[in-house]
Amino acid sequence: MLIIETLPMLRREVRRWRQDGKRVALVPTMGNLHDGHMTLVDEARERADIVIVSIFVNPMQFERADDLARYPRTLQEDCEKLNRRGVDLVFSPAPADIYPHGVDGQTFVDVPSLSTLLEGASRPGHFRGVSTIVSKLFNLVQPDLACFGEKDYQQLALIRKMVADMGYDIDIIGVPTVRAKDGLALSSRNGYLTAEERKIAPLLSKVMQQIAERLGQGERHVEEMMISAENTLAENGLRADGLAIVDADTLLPLNVDSQRAVILMAAWLGKARLIDNQQVDLTQ
């Protein structure tokens, strides 16, 4: 497995594989890899000849400097996991290589509406950072396909829209969320939880499942369901930071024509911001 830090070396290797007619997959990450990331890698391996994993803690995605500073960096352990998984290349650039003029001097990519809706409203600039770095990685690697987790539902929707709008010839593969046995969605930020908080955290997915069951039974009292969910979370020490039940295709409020809903949930538990989502078929 190659570990590359510079843009010219990355381009050289990608060019070589391209000349050999290889199909290339990209898995963008910020490192601190867990089993959810490995599922993305496995999906990429099934679909391509060459798997490239990027590890870059993107400063443009962080609103607070202290959050950026404490994000776990575990490059050596990550590379060992990826090597065992049969990854061909790890691209781990320094911020100065990605943003030579600094974040403030960087040309950015913005996806209208999806960047400021829902999760974007509570995290200004976050999705601009996502779309900018993903676009840059797409330009550098020029993959045939890229794999993203469905846990970050709005991010996946935003990337798909960006790819369509910008004319990228890249297949975007959404991979189902990987969960612990108690239902908690795997996340790098779960490491921020104390032992006691970890016992409480699965409540987020349980509340989400309760909403899904009510929607599946034909209930459409969205506001009442969200208030009830927020109260249940608060009673157990979770502070809601974005609860929504919206059309799964548009991320806009449900209407009579909506065929699928998605429940989007975000909540703080101690120092960890947990997110999760679940899609619901409304046609049955």
Curated annotation (Swiss-Prot):
Function in brief: Catalyzes the condensation of pantoate with beta-alanine in an ATP-dependent reaction via a pantoyl-adenylate intermediate.
UniProt pathway: Cofactor biosynthesis; (R)-pantothenate biosynthesis; (R)-pantothenate from (R)-pantoate and beta-alanine: step 1/1
Residues binding ATP: 30-37, 149-152, 178, 186-189
Positions annotated to bind (R)-pantoate: 61, 155
Residues at the catalytic site: 37
GO annotation, cellular component aspect: cytosol
Residue sites binding beta-alanine per the record: 61
Listed name of the protein: Pantothenate synthetase
UniProt gene name: panC
Keywords: ATP-binding, Cytoplasm, Ligase, Nucleotide-binding, Pantothenate biosynthesis
Further details from the record: The reaction proceeds by a bi uni uni bi ping pong mechanism.
Known catalytic reactions: (R)-pantoate + beta-alanine + ATP = (R)-pantothenate + AMP + diphosphate + H(+)
Compartment annotation: Cytoplasm
Pfam families referenced in this protein's UniProt entry, alphabetically: Pantoate_ligase
InterPro entries on file: Cyt_trans-like, Pantoate_ligase, Pantoate_ligase_C, Rossmann-like_a/b/a_fold
Subunit annotation: Homodimer.
